[in-house]
Amino acid sequence: MIKSVKVTNYLGESVQLRLGELEPKSGLLITNIEGLGPAKANINTTEMATNDGDVYNSSRLQKRNIVITLRFGWAPTIEDARQNSYKYFPIKRRLELLFETDNRVCKAYGYVESNEPNIFSDESETKISIICVDPYFYSVDENVLLFYSMEPTFEFPFENDSLEEPLLEMGNIWLKTERTVYYTGDAETGVVINIHAVGPVRNVTIYNMGTREVMKIDTSRLEEMTGYGIIAGDDITISTIRGKKSVYLLRNGVKTNIINCLDKQADWFQLAKGDNVFNYTAEYGSVNLQFRITNQIVYEGV
């Protein structure tokens, strides 16, 4: 069951509308919402002259159309409530919709297509049409998977038997080159891979063990572009999200596009439902790498 909808306009102004309850400040009451299920798909096929039926070619999801019906209450007047709908649902502007249900919190982004109030009705209300060019809903929080961990080992009381040798141990860093991302979403999604170097590294290779996909970073190309390969302090961010694919290097506060340093046959990883096992290696300096993978959960409907 849907509990509430939080609307945030392009100016960052927001209002949270609980289903079945009049929001006292805005005077808005949700009576109906359409378009929250899976979006309609286009299935592209080709007719065969000599065979029955068609041959499947491809498929894609259409844009999503969410229609919200609002009833106006006293805030302090009906006119104020109607004008608040213009404020929170500005025509042609982008807004964020955050849906809270019994077992899911997700968000979608869209543009207000129309706001059509019935001004002269005894029960004044409006229908607001929102076009979501991205038909999916996304989790609010990101899943973060670390390939390293830090274990504190310093304890009180402590003893230092030497003033010359470093005998005190403050902590241990544990590195793992293989970890599993468990994905629970309805549709495939990309990931963001963050690589932090604490020392020199040569030629990094990342694997998706389940799909046999490979992504390689050629440090010789990186050296040609920047003067160095991967060195201590470097941060490399790889995004495999559709529509946002990128590879950037952050070095000494300067952000550089290094997508040309990827192998030409590189695969752009996508998470499938269930276990997704990732592994990384390097020709030299793999112990100098700290990996982190983040992803959002993608839902087909609320």
Describe these PLM feature segments.
Residues 145-302:
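Intrinsically disordered, low-complexity segments enriched in serine, threonine, and glycine
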Residues 70-74, 101, 114, 132-136, ...:
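Beta-strand elements of well-folded, non-transmembrane domains
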